Amino acid sequence: KLMTMIAALEDQVIDTLQMIDTENGELDFYGFKVRDSRKGGYGKINAMDIFRLSSNTGMVKIITDAYEGKSEKFVNRLYNMGVNNPIDLGIKGEPNPKIPHPSENDWNGLSLPWMSYGYGILLTPLQILSFYNGIANNGEMVKPTFLESTSKLGSTNFYEFKKEIINPSICSKKTLSIVQKMLLDV
């Protein structure tokens, strides 16, 4: 949901105080339900609370209202964050991220609403962690580094690693400041 909120803020289709009706906590798309974890939903809440409460219906409404018929703009915004690029950690079996695009054959009417709250995409925990670390690192997403061993305390041996930047700027400084504050309330 963090990536979704960043996309919406970057494209200025939402502001944090804008009120969204999460209905009764349930939305129907082509016979499939999107539900909030809270039975009965949250009613009308602002975008900041949608993020804080992790409202699936709220995120879906923000994204479908803003990007219906413009799905490519939303997906391209995610791609611009760098989340569709492999990290290449050298770990055997590490999958490439999969973020569907409207130009692909498997794109359908459920793709946009599902993606808005993290369904229908494939990211490993390390890919997600790298993204969150990028937010904590003032927008700079860095490739994780793994140590094979460490030296004993007091030893003169130490390791120095070159920082490998995946994306120097996930989003604008304005959006970064907003989402950093939002994350403090989660």
Provide a role label for each language-model segment.
Residues M3-V186:
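Beta-lactam-recognizing serine transpeptidase/beta-lactamase-like catalytic domain environment
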